[in-house]
């Protein structure tokens, strides 16, 4: 970053890499990246579409390291799955760079979506869903870890809160992992 600071506008990161296999970064990675962004005047942009709103055992995944992103991207869980909602959040220092008429969106400013998101976030708070995800995630990883010790089916479990991955001992050509997913679906 030091060599190219003049050409880097920001650093976009999923606090926990989701689709690639639920990879949790080493402790201090996010706070270190945020510090580098501050040092070189680059925006720290957190993509919390998959990790945000209580899923990882905190309100946001960046909260595990007390990192405040310059820009926060949310979706999916912000409405509790009730209504399609997404948001890009930043403070005035960032948002006021965009002048009226410079940016538009197809469904922007939807009052129903905003009301649904507000209520869903209140439920997350009132029902302590982040704390529940942290507790249940610990139980899940312990139980799967114990199962791994006695089974040859799974080899590893990783994650935070209720965002987890279980690595299946299989080949790429096999359908074992898919069949396990179908069995889990069929059994609730």
Q: What kind of feature is each model-predicted range?
A:
Residues 1-188:
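Conserved N-terminal phosphate-binding loop of PLP-dependent enzymes in the Aspartate aminotransferase
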């Amino acid at each position: 970053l030091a060599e190219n600071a003049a050409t880097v506008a920001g650093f976009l990161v999923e606090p926990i890499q989701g689709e690639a296999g639920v990879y949790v970064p080493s402790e201090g990675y996010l706070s270190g990246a945020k510090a580098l962004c501050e040092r070189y005047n680059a925006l720290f942009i957190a993509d919390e579409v998959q990790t945000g709103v209580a899923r990882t055992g905190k309100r946001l995944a960046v909260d595990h390291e007390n990192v405040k992103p310059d820009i926060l991207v949310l979706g999916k869980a912000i409405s509790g799955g009730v209504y399609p909602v997404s948001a890009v959040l930043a403070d005035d220092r960032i948002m006021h760079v965009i002048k009226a008429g410079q940016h538009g969106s197809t469904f922007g400013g939807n009052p129903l979506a905003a009301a649904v998101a507000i209520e869903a976030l209140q439920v997350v708070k009132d029902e302590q869903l982040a704390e529940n995800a942290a507790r249940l995630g610990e139980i899940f990883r312990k139980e799967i870890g114990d199962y791994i010790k006695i089974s040859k089916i799974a080899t590893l479990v990783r994650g935070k809160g209720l965002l987890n991955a279980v690595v299946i001992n299989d080949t790429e050509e096999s359908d074992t992992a898919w069949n396990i997913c179908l069995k889990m679906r069929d059994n609730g």
